[in-house]
C-alpha cells in the first residue's frame, strides 16, 4: 500500500506515510477515501514522503486538479493545517506546487507547509512536544 494512514483522535490529526512508488491516482483515491469521512472534519494532516522511492510524475494539470478537489472538500470546514515532510527536492517541489494551487482556491481552508524534517513539520503543527509521530 503506497499510502498508509492512521487517525489520531487525541491529537485531531491524520498521519499518512507514502511508501515506494506513488501515483497520482493513489493520491486522488487517498484524498477522497480519507477526507470524505465526517470524523476527520477539522483535523490537521501530516504526510511523510520520506519513504517514497519514485513518483510517477503527474502532469501540472493533475496537481492543479488535486488541489481543486482537495479545496472543494474543505467547504464548511474550520481552518486546518497540512504539513508535508519531503526531504528530497523533487517531492519538496511537488508539495510546494500543490500548496500554492490549493491556497489560491477560494474554497480552501487548509494551510499547507512543506518541510525537510519531521521535527520542523511537527513544530509547525504545534506538536513539537510530542514524540516523533509515525503511521
Predicted regions and their residues:
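Amphipathic, Lys/Arg-enriched alpha-helical "gate/interface" segment within cytosolic domains
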Residues: 1-135
Amino acid at each position: 500500500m503506497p499510502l498508509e494512514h492512521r487517525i489520531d483522535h487525541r491529537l485531531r490529526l491524520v498521519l499518512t506515510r507514502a511508501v515506494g512508488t506513488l501515483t497520482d491516482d493513489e493520491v486522488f483515491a487517498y484524498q477522497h477515501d480519507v477526507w470524505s469521512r465526517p470524523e476527520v472534519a477539522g483535523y490537521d494532516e501530516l504526510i511523510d514522503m520520506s519513504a517514497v522511492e519514485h513518483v510517477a510524475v503527474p502532469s501540472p494539470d493533475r496537481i492543479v486538479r488535486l488541489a481543486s478537489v482537495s479545496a472543494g472538500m474543505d467547504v464548511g470546514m474550520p481552518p486546518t493545517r497540512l504539513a508535508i515532510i519531503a526531504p528530497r527536492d523533487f517531492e519538496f517541489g511537488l508539495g510546494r506546487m500543490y500548496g500554492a494551487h490549493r491556497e489560491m482556491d477560494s474554497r480552501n481552508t487548509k494551510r499547507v507547509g512543506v518541510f525537510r524534517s519531521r521535527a520542523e513539520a511537527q513544530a509547525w503543527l504545534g506538536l513539537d512536544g510530542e514524540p516523533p509521530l509515525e503511521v
